[in-house]
Amino acid sequence: LRMKELSNINSKKGSINYKIRLVVQTLVFAAFICLLIFADPIAEKDGTVDVFLRMSPLSAIGAMVAAKEFIVRYWPAFIVLVASVFLGRFFCGWVCPLGTTLDITDSLLKKRRKMISYKIYDGKRLKYYILAFLLLSLFIGHQMVGWLDPISISTNAYTVVIHPYFVSLINSFFDFLHKFYFVSFVSDPVHAFLKEALFALHPPFFRGHFIFLIVISVIIFLGLFYKRYWCRNLCPLGALFALLSGWSIFKRVVGESVCDSCDRCNVDCKMGAIDDTGMKTQAGECILCMKCQAICHTSAVRFTRTQPSEQDVPINLTKRGFVTACVSSAVVAPLLSLSFKKKKSQGNLRIIRPPGSIPEDKFRAKCIRCGECMRVCKTNGLHPTILEADLSGMWTPQLIPRIGYCAHDCVLCTKVCPSGAITRLSKEKK
C-alpha cells in the first residue's frame, strides 16, 4: 500500500513537472516572437530586443574568439553556460526557440513520420564534430558560428522567411475582405491596427531569402525521419551543453524494481536519449522535457543528482571523427577567403555596411549573422549578402539604397546588434 501511495505521488509530480515545462516553454517562445514583432517600438524606446541572441554561449565564444576581445554584452550567455553545468541541457528543452519550433512542426509531421519506413543516419556524435569544426575555424580566423547557431537560425527564419510571407498573407486576406462593403467597415480598421502595431507598412522583402527558406525547410523536414533531428545530430550549441551536462543535478534514474519495460519512454523520447530497455539514458542527450516521467504508468522515472553507473550511456566519440573535423576545418576555412566580386583599388569590397559598423575585418569577426538589424530597418534597405562579401562574409548585412534608403533620423540597427559589430549611434552623431 505504501509503495502504491509513493507511486501515485511520483506520477502526479511527473505530470506537474511536464506541465510546468510546457508552460515555461510556451511563455519563452511567446516572448521570443513578441520581441521580433515589436522590435521597432521597443528599440525606439531603448529597450532590449536582442536578449535571446545574447543568451547563446556559442555565439558569444564565436564573436569573442574571432574578434580577439571580451564582449561584455554577452553576460546572459555566461549565465546560461554556468546554469547548464548544474541543469544540463535545460536550454534546449525549455528555452531554445528553434527547439520549440521543431516541437511544433514535428507534431504536425507525426502521421507522415509513421508512414515512412526508411530511416536516415541518426548519429548523435556528429554534432560534437561540427562543434570542433566551428571552434577550430575561429582560431584559423574565420567566423562560421553564426551560420549554425540555433538562435541565429531562429531569428533569421522568422525575420527573413516567415515574417514577410505572413505579412503578405495577412494583407491578401484583408484586401479580399475589403471587396465586401458590409465587412470592410470592420476589417479595414483591424487591418490598419495590425499594420501599425504588428507589421511593417509594406511586406518586407529580402534578397536571397530563398536560400534560408531551403535551410529552414530542410531542418524542419528532417523531422519526417526522427523528432528533433537537428537537435539530436547537428546542433553545435546542443553539443556544447551536452559536454557540460556531466555535472547536472537533474539526471534521469529508473527504479528497476518498478519498471515493467513497456518501452513507451523510449518510443516517446524526442531526443532518442533512452535505450531500448528504457533503463539507460544518455545524460548529454536529455533535454529535461519531463515527458518520460509524465507518461510512466508505474512511476519508475525520477530526476535526481546521482545516476547509477549502469544506467548511464557514455558519449561514443572517435579520434577519427575529431581528426576529420579538424582537417576539414583547416581545409575549408581558408577557402572562405575566395573572392567572387571585384574590389576597389584600395582593396575594399563594393558593399555598404549599416551605419555604425566597425572596420570590415572586425565586422566579419563579430557579426553572428542573426539578421536582427535587417528586421528593424524601416525602409527594408538592409539585406543579407550572398557572395558580395566573399564566402566568409555570407549573410552579413549590407545596405542597398536602390531597394531602401537609410533614413536620416533612424538608428534602430545600431541598437539591436548583440555582438557590437554595429556600434550604437545617436541620431545627432549619425
Predicted ranges, named:
Residues 2-279, 284-430:
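Non-ligating segments of multi-cofactor redox enzymes
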